Structures are given as C-alpha cells and as structure tokens.
Amino acid sequence: MNTSPLPVGVVQLNSELLALESNLSAHADWIRTAQSESLELLLFPELSLTGYQLGRRTPEAAMRADDERLKSLARIAPNMTVVVGFVEQVSPGEYYNAVAYLKQGEIAAVYRKINLPTYGGLEEGKWYHPGEELVQVECKPNWTASTLICADLWNPALVHCAMLRRPELLLAPVNSASAIVSDEFSNENNWQTNVSFYAMLYGVPVLMANRYGAEGDAWFWGGSRILGPRGEILAQAEDRECLISAELDLNSIAAARFDHPAIRDANTPLIQRLLNQS
C-alpha cells in the first residue's frame, strides 16, 4: 500500500459579503500560496466565496456547480484538491449551502449541507434546501475525505454515517460567529470540544476552517485548526487571516483506529434495528 503522507492546509479568511469577484481573487491568491508550499489538500471555510448572512439576497450569490468561475479556481493548482464554499443554484429559486471539490482542473464533486440551523441568530432553513447525500472524494491514492458543513457536525448521526464509509479525513468548513446561538452557548469552547471529540472517537484527522473578522454585527472568531487522529492539535490559526498546514500520516491513523476501533465495532445492523424501533 502507498502510505505516503498528505500535506494539508486550511485557509482562515474573512470573505466579503456578496463580493464574489473580490473573494474569487482572494481564493486564487491563497491557492497559489498553498501550491508554493507543496500542499495537496486545501480547505476554505463555509460559504467562503459569498459571505454568510445573505438572506433575501441569496440568489445574487448563487452559481451552478459547473460555473466557469469555479473551474478557473480548479485550474490554478490541478495537482491539489481544493474545497471551497459557495451557494449552489440547482433550479430557479432553489439553492444549497454547498462546497465544491476542485481537483485536476475540474469540479470533482459537490456536497450540500444537510443540517440547516434555524435557531438563535441562524436562519439557513429560510433560504436553502437541505442536502440529502453524503459525499466522499479521493484526494490521492489511499486518502479519501468526507465533508460535513458546520451544523452538520452538531448532528452526531450524520458524523457517524460519514465515518462508517471509513474516510481517512473529515473536513469541517464552518461559519461560526460568537454568541450567534445564544450568549450562554460558547461557539469558541464548544467547537473545540466538538472537533477534538470526533477526531479522537473515530481516529480521524479533522480539518476545521472558520472565518475571522466581522460581517455586519456578527464576529467570526477564527480558531481554525488541524487535528490529528487522537484529537491532538497539529496546527491552529492565530487571530488573523492566514494559512495553516500540517502533514498527515496513514500509519498514525491506523494506529489510532486499532487502539480504539469505534468504526470496526459500530455494529451497524443492531443500530439500524434500534432506530427502526424508535
């Protein structure tokens, strides 16, 4: 088996609301920077091309999955897998909060956010259609990645289903703002608990990409990080726009999953029967 390591990166940036051309230019610059560092996988935050609080202006930000602007980003670094956040239009008036996997100069896959939060200061269920399928993409031989977008990771069943497919990586693009759920719910502390728990539980490296900066009254606190398969922090962003990177190793993943075989011992048939009884 080819057990060559995978150099990965996470971009922490502050997208400008509805400024697609400016955001595309910023993405291109970060992709070139990552390419110069010989990274093979690069993750941007949720809705990185559009900004977050789109509301009734969501249609202005939308593009189809085969949009030439996405393809132009893919062509910058054809030997790198790049994951960017965008609003996908699938039919007139129907939109998804989505990410595109850019690979070999093409759009290799699109994942659509399933769990749309509509509580606190979050209103995604008003503007987007929920996705219905999980997606797994091969970044290079023996390295596959699954993506769950932000609130997807607050539905444990979605994480479990994604991990039953045994990806080597879990990608977590988010748009997390301070106190947007409530004053008592600390996004900063709770996201740290969330991603480190899943990394440790499933023996999976987690790449978390959050924004940093203001959008209207919202403050996106950053905290982007790369976690190893035991929940350890391999790289963490400072309080600014930046690129962080780490090198991941298949042997470390195998050792973590051998020590704690959560996926091997999942007993999916029993869980399915119990779900059918509930």
Question: Whereabouts are the PLM-identified features?
Answer:
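A conserved C-terminal secondary-structure "cap"
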Residues: 253-278
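Short beta-strand scaffold segments in enzyme catalytic cores
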Residues: 84-86, 97-101, 135-137, 224-226, ...
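Short Pro/Gly-enriched beta-strand edge/turn motifs at strand-loop
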Residues: 82-86, 113-122, 206-210
